[in-house]
Regions:
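Radical SAM enzyme [4Fe-4S]-AdoMet core and its adjacent flexible, acidic
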Residues: 1, 136, 141-143, 147-258
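Conserved alpha-helical substructure of the radical SAM core
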Residues: 2-128, 132-136
Length: 258
C-alpha cells in the first residue's frame, strides 16, 4: 500500500467476525456512518488527576453546553436513519447526565449495538434499567485495586468498592466487560494488584500510559502524572558500546564496512 492510500478501520480489524467485517467493509464502500460515539456529558462523580474531559457543572457553559435528552434522542434518530448500528455511550461519566435513563431507554429501543463506557461506580443505582435494557458490552475504567489508590488517582472516597460492585453486577447479568486502565505515577505501584484482579475475574484488560493535555483549559499536571522512563547507566552503556565496536573475532578490514 502506498503512503497516500487510506486504510479504513474495517481492514485493520482482523479480530472481527467475518460477517461483521463484511458489514463494515460495505459501510465503508457506501460511505455509511456505521459506528459513532456519543459523549453525553462532561460531568463526572470522579475527579481523576489525568482527565481531560471532566468539567464541574459551573464550567460547562464556558466551553459550550450540555445537550438535553430530547436533543440526544433526535441526533440518535438521525444517526439511525443514516445507517449507524454501533454506538459507544461515554462522558465524562454518562450516568451523570440528568436525563440518562430517558436517553438510554430510547437508544436501546432504536436497535443500536451499544457499548457503555463508564467508571462503574454508579451502575448499581441503575440495576433495574440495565436488566430491562442491557448494553451489548461495557468498557470500564479501572484505576486501582483498592480505595486508597482510587483516593490518590480519582480523588474520591470508596471508588474501588463502588466500581467493583458495578463490575460484579454486570458479570451476574452476563454482560461482557472490558477493563481499561490509565497508568500514572500515582497507581504505578498498584499495577501488579490490578493484574491480579483482572486475572481473578477473567476479564479483558487494556493498560495505557498516555496522558493527554486538555485543549480547553482543564488543569492537568503532566509533570507529576506521566511515567518517566528509567535513567540509563551511561557508564554501562559506553562499556556495552565499546564491546560491540571491538570484537576480537573480527578481522580489522571488516570494520570499514560498518
Amino acid at each position: 500500500m502506498s503512503e497516500q492510500q487510506f486504510e479504513p478501520a474495517c481492514r485493520r480489524m482482523e479480530w472481527l467476525d467475518p460477517f461483521y467485517k463484511a458489514v463494515w467493509e460495505k459501510a465503508y464502500a457506501d460511505a455509511i456512518p456505521i459506528s459513532g460515539t456519543f459523549e453525553l456529558t462532561p460531568r463526572c462523580n470522579f475527579n481523576c488527576r489525568m482527565c481531560y474531559v471532566h468539567l464541574p457543572e459551573n464550567e460547562i457553559k464556558k466551553h459550550g453546553t450540555e445537550l438535553t435528552g430530547a436533543e440526544w434522542i433526535r441526533i440518535a434518530q438521525e444517526a439511525k436513519d443514516a445507517g449507524t448500528t454501533w454506538l459507544c455511550i461515554t462522558g465524562g461519566e454518562p450516568l451523570m447526565h440528568p436525563e440518562f435513563e430517558t436517553i438510554w431507554r430510547e437508544l436501546t429501543q432504536m436497535g443500536f449495538f451499544i457499548t457503555l463506557q463508564t467508571n462503574a461506580s454508579l451502575l448499581t443505582e441503575y440495576e433495574k434499567l440495565f436488566e430491562e435494557c442491557p448494553p451489548r458490552a461495557c468498557k470500564i475504567t479501572l484505576y486501582g485495586s483498592n480505595d486508597q489508590v482510587y483516593r490518590d488517582v480519582c480523588r474520591v472516597e470508596n471508588g474501588f468498592t463502588k466500581a467493583d460492585a458495578g463490575i460484579r453486577m454486570l458479570r451476574q447479568m452476563k454482560i461482557p466487560v472490558e477493563l481499561v486502565s490509565t497508568v500514572i505515577q500515582q497507581n504505578l505501584d498498584d499495577v501488579e494488584n490490578i493484574i491480579r484482579y483482572v486475572e481473578k475475574n477473567k476479564l479483558r484488560w487494556i493498560p495505557n500510559i498516555n496522558v493527554r493535555t486538555a485543549g480547553r483549559g482543564v488543569d492537568v499536571d503532566m509533570e507529576h502524572l506521566r511515567i518517566r522512563p528509567p535513567k540509563k547507566d551511561s557508564n554501562a552503556e559506553q562499556e556495552s558500546s565499546r564491546k560491540n565496536l571491538v570484537d576480537p573475532e573480527r578481522k580489522p578490514c571488516t570494520y570499514c564496512k560498518d
